[in-house]
Amino acid sequence: MFIQEPKKLIDTGEIGNASTGDILFDGGNKINSDFNAIYNAFGDQRKMAVANGTGADGQIIHATGYYQKHSITEYATPVKVGTRHDIDTSTVGVKVIIERGELGDCVEFINSNGSISVTNPLTIQAIDSIKGVSGNLVVTSPYSKVTLRCISSDNSTSVWNYSIESMFGQKESPAEGTWNISTSGSVDIPLFHRTEYNMAKLLVTCQSVDGRKIKTAEINILVDTVNSEVISSEYAVMRVGNETEEDEIANIAFSIKENYVTATISSSTVGMRAAVKVIATQKIGVAQ
């Protein structure tokens, strides 16, 4: 594991006084040290072992950043804050130690070969503590991305919080926003192309201008591209201000219009607004 060195500045001396400042040798070493730090932050540190990372197969800078691939023995030393690591537990579980951080510091781990498992986990130990974790944080899901960020660094101790997510999969939200229901009493909201997803789950909230009438619901929709239909199931419905049990406040229907799955929301209440968010999607054919 390459140990980064603090930034070095060349002493340029005093103008007109040739006897001041760094000599060429010292200045060149400082430049090399600074460039090594840059290339080892944004490139493969393993390539430093050959010709200091130079040559045809030497280090290159990755604009997206680089997740370092270290051996298990190298992780006996605490990892530096601000670094990224690609963890391989193919042969045995890996334990990493995070050094004390300052507020806002971040460390990231990924598992690009999917080797993390219950048998060979990634174990993360903070020198101080990880919020909500008693002892070490143990990650057992393959292809995980773990992000830790320092949320407190008072009195010489630091507290880290974390998130764990899959490296892969579709995570986009094809539709999210707020629409005004027009004076005609309805609004069409295009969600996504009819062939883009097989099903989707939505959160829908409708509210009057004065806030006295509110309806919220979760809705599952299934896209039938053969018959050009959308089948929906509305559940977890909550209403405020409905005059009778039959008063829906707002009606939500789905159809395919101009090749787009479309939500049509209608209401007899003037000035109603509708917030719609697609919170999950599913498509046959997504990679495992």
UniProtKB/Swiss-Prot annotation:
UniProt entry tagged with the keyword Coiled coil: yes
A cellular component annotation (GO) from this entry: virus tail, baseplate
Protein's UniProt keywords contain Transmembrane: no
Keywords assigned by UniProt, alphabetized: Coiled coil, Viral baseplate protein, Viral release from host cell, Viral tail assembly, Viral tail protein, Virion
Coiled coil: 20-80
Highest taxon of source: Viruses
Transmembrane segments: none
Subcellular location: Virion
Pfam families hit by this protein: T4_gp9_10_C, T4_gp9_10_N
Induction / repression: Expressed in the late phase of the viral replicative cycle.
Alphabetical list of Gene3D superfamilies matching this protein: 4-oxalocrotonate tautomerase-like, Bacteriophage t4 gene product 9 (gp9), gp9
Principal localisation: virion
An annotated GO BP: viral tail assembly
Subunit note: Homotrimer. The gp9 trimer interacts with the long tail fiber (LTF) that comprises gp34 trimer, gp35, gp36 and a gp37 trimer. Part of the baseplate macromolecular complex which consists of gp5, gp5.4, gp27 (central spike complex); gp6, gp25, gp53 (inner baseplate); gp7, gp8 (intermediate baseplate); gp9, gp10, gp11, gp12 (peripheral); gp48 and gp54 (proximal region of the tail tube).
Annotated function: Peripheral baseplate protein that is part of the tail fiber network. Connects the long tail fibers to the baseplate and, after virus attachment to a host cell, probably changes its conformation to trigger the signal for tail contraction. Involved in the tail assembly.
Domain comment as written in the entry: The C-terminus is bound to the baseplate, and the N-terminus coiled-coil domain is associated with the long tail fibers.
Protein name: Baseplate protein gp9
Species name: Enterobacteria phage T4
Lineage: Viruses, Duplodnaviria, Heunggongvirae, Uroviricota, Caudoviricetes
